[in-house]
Amino acid sequence: MIDALVLVAKLPEAYAIFDPLVDVLPVIPVLFLALAFVWQAAVGFR
Protein backbone atom coordinates (compact mmCIF):
# COMPACT_ATOMS: atom_id res chain seq x y z
CA MET A 1 0.00 0.00 0.00
CA ILE A 2 2.73 2.44 1.02
CA ASP A 3 4.84 1.34 -1.96
CA ALA A 4 2.00 2.24 -4.33
CA LEU A 5 1.70 5.70 -2.74
CA VAL A 6 5.44 6.30 -3.13
CA LEU A 7 5.22 5.19 -6.78
CA VAL A 8 2.33 7.59 -7.47
CA ALA A 9 4.21 10.38 -5.70
CA LYS A 10 7.24 9.84 -7.96
CA LEU A 11 5.23 9.75 -11.23
CA PRO A 12 5.14 13.55 -11.80
CA GLU A 13 8.95 13.64 -11.59
CA ALA A 14 9.18 10.77 -14.07
CA TYR A 15 6.97 12.62 -16.56
CA ALA A 16 8.76 15.96 -16.12
CA ILE A 17 10.74 15.35 -19.33
CA PHE A 18 7.43 15.25 -21.27
CA ASP A 19 6.38 18.75 -20.13
CA PRO A 20 7.47 20.45 -23.39
CA LEU A 21 5.55 17.80 -25.35
CA VAL A 22 2.39 18.41 -23.31
CA ASP A 23 2.74 22.14 -24.02
CA VAL A 24 2.73 21.41 -27.77
CA LEU A 25 -0.10 18.83 -27.85
CA PRO A 26 -3.07 21.30 -27.87
CA VAL A 27 -1.68 22.91 -31.06
CA ILE A 28 -1.85 19.67 -33.10
CA PRO A 29 -5.58 19.92 -34.07
CA VAL A 30 -4.93 23.45 -35.37
CA LEU A 31 -2.12 22.04 -37.52
CA PHE A 32 -4.54 19.48 -38.96
CA LEU A 33 -7.00 22.28 -39.77
CA ALA A 34 -4.23 24.23 -41.52
CA LEU A 35 -3.17 21.07 -43.37
CA ALA A 36 -6.74 20.53 -44.61
CA PHE A 37 -6.85 24.12 -45.90
CA VAL A 38 -3.49 23.78 -47.67
CA TRP A 39 -4.63 20.48 -49.20
CA GLN A 40 -7.84 22.05 -50.51
CA ALA A 41 -5.89 25.00 -51.90
CA ALA A 42 -3.58 22.52 -53.65
CA VAL A 43 -6.48 20.66 -55.33
CA GLY A 44 -8.26 23.93 -56.18
CA PHE A 45 -11.16 23.66 -53.68
CA ARG A 46 -12.98 21.00 -55.68
Curated annotation (Swiss-Prot):
Gene Ontology terms: biological process: photosynthesis
Cytoplasmic side: 40-46
Keywords, in A-Z order: Membrane, Photosynthesis, Photosystem II, Reaction center, Thylakoid, Transmembrane, Transmembrane helix
Cofactor annotation remark: PSII binds multiple chlorophylls, carotenoids and specific lipids.
Outcome of gene disruption: No changes in growth under low, medium or high light regimes (3-300 umol photon/m(2)/s). PsbZ and Psb30/Ycf12 are missing from isolated PSII, although low levels of PsbZ can be detected in thylakoid membranes.
Lumenal topological domain: 10-19
Pro-sequence residue ranges: 1-9
InterPro entries, per the entry: PSII_PsbK, PSII_PsbK_sf
Bilayer topology term: Single-pass membrane protein
Main localization (coarse): membrane
One cellular component term from this protein's GO annotations in UniProt: plasma membrane-derived thylakoid membrane
Annotated compartments: Cellular thylakoid membrane
Transmembrane portions of the chain: 20-39
PANTHER family assigned to the protein according to its UniProt record, in alphabetical order: PHOTOSYSTEM II REACTION CENTER PROTEIN K, PTHR35325
Physiological role: One of the components of the core complex of photosystem II (PSII). PSII is a light-driven water:plastoquinone oxidoreductase that uses light energy to abstract electrons from H(2)O, generating O(2) and a proton gradient subsequently used for ATP formation. It consists of a core antenna complex that captures photons, and an electron transfer chain that converts photonic excitation into a charge separation. Required for association of PsbZ and Psb30/Ycf12 with PSII.
Assembly behavior: PSII is composed of 1 copy each of membrane proteins PsbA, PsbB, PsbC, PsbD, PsbE, PsbF, PsbH, PsbI, PsbJ, PsbK, PsbL, PsbM, PsbT, PsbX, PsbY, PsbZ, Psb30/Ycf12, peripheral proteins PsbO, CyanoQ(PsbQ), PsbU, PsbV and a large number of cofactors. It forms dimeric complexes. Part of a photosystem II (PSII) assembly intermediate complex PSII-I; crystallized from a strain deleted of psbJ, it forms monomeric PSII before addition of the oxygen evolving complex. PSII-I includes 3 assembly factors not found in mature PSII (Psb27, Psb28 and Psb34).
Family named by the database record: Belongs to the PsbK family.
Protein name from the UniProt record: Photosystem II reaction center protein K
